[in-house]
Amino acid sequence: MYHHINPHKGDMVTVTPEVFEGQMAYLHNAGYRTLRIDELVSYIKGELSLNQKAAVITFDDGWLDNYIYAFPALKKYSINAAIFIITDRIERASLHNERNNPSSVPTHKESKLLIEKKEDYRVALNWGHIKEMSDSGLVEFYSHTKSHMKCNDLPEDELLEEIGKSKKIIEEKMGRPCPYLCWPYGKYNDTALRIAVNTGYEAIFITGHGVVEKGSDPLAIKRIVVKDSVAWFKNKMVIYINPVLSRLYLMFRKKF
């Protein structure tokens, strides 16, 4: 699970472009198949068999730096990825006609302040970026709700707005179904889950740490937060690709 890809080394939820490219190069050179979300869901349901190493690359929030710094590496190594977008931000960013591709991008803290000031175009993707990335055949886009609210304590009418409206907007803009959702901050409750399922979401991603296996719950797909290190990435991939090592490591990690 990624958020920002930019040069602000050491910043919150950020991987630097050089490290990100190194991680993607490793996946490519080590023979990993990067799955699309449809393929992942088919694998969970037992409808898809995998005879090679596989991984799923996801980004949360839809930051502009994903286009500037991550997209070139994804294209270079033919890596599939999914970005979960916050439609209010995308819509506001798209009100500006220019394709804002700055030579530098703000830190995470600065980005949040710009969002609060409604200057989304300076930090968020717009529909032009999204179309270009989608047209590459490598990057797909799904819902991270309408405005990135925690979904564990909202009334039902607001949940319907957050979960349903974002889905509708993405489907209208992309011209295809949006059956996948990612909870903001990983926060949700039974009511939110029920509304999401009734709205038509078929698989949902959370922030819980773990790997996906056949038979995993498609409504609570776990992920791994990626650190800003190629060595860390390689070591963790060796562990997580092995079912026995993975279970032992996750058991030990949970205990301590």
Predicted features, each with a name:
Residues W63-L64, S147:
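Short, glycine/acidic-enriched loop or turn micro-motifs at the edges of active sites
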Residues H3-N6, K53-A55, K75-N189, A220-I221:
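Metal-dependent polysaccharide deacetylase catalytic core of the NodB/CE4 family, i.e.
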Residues M1-T58, L64-D65, Y69, S136, ...:
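C-terminal active-site subregion of NodB/CE4 polysaccharide deacetylases
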